[in-house]
């Protein structure tokens, strides 16, 4: 909803054109759905869903050098998350990764 088919880590990252005619991106829950029990409000909301190119998506799941990326994503979403009733600090977000 917020990304316009661009990678939220770096809007210049390129991907291929999908069958729907849009640049292919992957949806990722910034706060993982596996953490839902730690939150009163649903994590499955637009404010918590980010758009990532396939490489950045894999990096967040499997990479070791993700602190800068998490900080950038957190800073871009913290206010939207609050508006959705989801309160989290960067320190706590990093614990899920």
Indicate where each model-derived feature is located:
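Short cysteine-rich loop/turn motifs with clustered Cys
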Residues: 1-28, 53-55
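Polybasic, low-complexity binding patches
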Residues: 31-94
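PLD/PLD-like phosphodiesterase catalytic module centered on the HKD motif
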Residues: 97
């Amino acid at each position: 909803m917020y990304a316009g088919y661009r990678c939220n880590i770096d809007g210049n990252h390129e991907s291929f054109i999908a069958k729907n005619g849009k640049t292919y991106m992957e949806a990722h829950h910034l706060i993982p759905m596996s953490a839902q029990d730690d939150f009163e409000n649903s994590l499955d909301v637009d404010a918590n869903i980010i758009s990532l190119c396939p490489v950045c998506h894999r990096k967040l799941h499997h990479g070791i050098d993700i602190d800068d990326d998490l900080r950038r994503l957190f800073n871009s979403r913290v206010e939207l998350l609050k508006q959705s009733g989801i309160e989290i600090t960067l320190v706590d977000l990093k614990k899920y990764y």
